Amino acid sequence: MDLSNLKPAEGATQAGQRLGRGEGSGRGGHSSTRGTKGQSSRSGSGTRPIWFEGGQTPLFQRVPKHGFNNAPFRTDYAIANVKRLQRLLDEEVLDEDEPVTPEVLADLGVVRTANRVKILGDGDLFDALEVKAHAFSESARQKIKQAGGSVTVVDQ
């Protein structure tokens, strides 16, 4: 006994109606159970997309175009907050004497990639750090400098 031997129980299935195979079949000839004329009698009259409005000009064409989308040219940054840098210092993962670069942050798993890194100013920083990144928020700049550190913007 295997899957190829399995069959449905007697009477459990019904053969589908063979339409359009001549008048003698009882379901054939001219209109084949579809009624007479109209959209639903034609081929391809199945379910239409949800936005189809029956031939009326659809809403998205009636409403004027609006706005601008710069998505293809957007600059995406991997972000790290100063509180994360402070936590790494507290856990002695980072060394105060070594500069913090995008490569260091990527190696530690703070950011996924070192390609473009932006430092944001959430949290507090108490130790002086030399931080190098592609971009800094204004608050991050202030907090790093207040702690006695330095900020360097590296090229893309």
Swiss-Prot record:
Signal peptide: none
Family matches, as Pfam families: Ribosomal_L27A (PF00828)
Annotated segments matching region Disordered: 1-56
GO molecular function: rRNA binding; structural constituent of ribosome
Alphabetical UniProt keywords: Ribonucleoprotein, Ribosomal protein, RNA-binding, rRNA-binding
GO cellular component: cytosolic large ribosomal subunit
Coiled coil spans: none
An example Gene Ontology biological process: translation
Family matches, as InterPro entries: Ribosomal_uL15, Ribosomal_uL15/eL18, Ribosomal_uL15/eL18_sf, Ribosomal_uL15_bac-type, Ribosomal_uL15_CS
Homology family: Belongs to the universal ribosomal protein uL15 family.
Oligomeric and partner information: Part of the 50S ribosomal subunit.
PANTHER family (alphabetical): 50S RIBOSOMAL PROTEIN L15, LARGE RIBOSOMAL SUBUNIT PROTEIN UL15M
Xref: NCBIfam families: rplO_bact
Role played: Binds to the 23S rRNA.
Protein name: Large ribosomal subunit protein uL15
UniProt source species: Salinibacter ruber (strain DSM 13855 / M31)
Designated gene of the protein: rplO
